[in-house]
């Protein structure tokens, strides 16, 4: 009985003859390729896998080192910022101390100038007062000397001389 599915009929069909379909040849070729390429490609893939693993381990090591370096750098930065802040605050304190010292020196210098001026003024006042006293005394003596001979008699002159001597003895 003829099978309508055979290729000899002119249509599409399934050829069950193993030798005509090269199925055995394909199985052999695929098997040989699998066996040959398994070792060859397996070695290549294994070497590639090892290289990738090594690169990953190196990358992880560099990442750990970079993380450590970053942490150290951040600590150094924080320390540097603290030091800079301390220097800045010390500078401000020093500037304030210098300013206050300058103010105190200026105040003291002004006080000294004022004291000197006051002392000069007092000395000049004392000198002028003394000069005025002398001039007043000389004027009074001149006036008395001109008027005295006409006003005093011999007894009055004696009393005046005795009173003057007694005043000189008390002083």
Curated annotation (Swiss-Prot):
It is a single-pass membrane protein. It comes from Synechococcus sp. (strain WH7803). It comes from the Bacteria. Keywords: ATP synthesis, CF(0), Hydrogen ion transport, Ion transport, Membrane, Thylakoid, Transmembrane, Transmembrane helix, Transport. The chain crosses the membrane at residues 24-44. F(1)F(0) ATP synthase produces ATP from ADP in the presence of a proton or sodium gradient. F-type ATPases consist of two structural domains, F(1) containing the extramembraneous catalytic core and F(0) containing the membrane proton channel, linked together by a central stalk and a peripheral stalk. During catalysis, ATP synthesis in the catalytic domain of F(1) is coupled via a rotary mechanism of the central stalk subunits to proton translocation. Component of the F(0) channel, it forms part of the peripheral stalk, linking F(1) to F(0). This is ATP synthase subunit b. HAMAP family: ATP_synth_b_bprime.
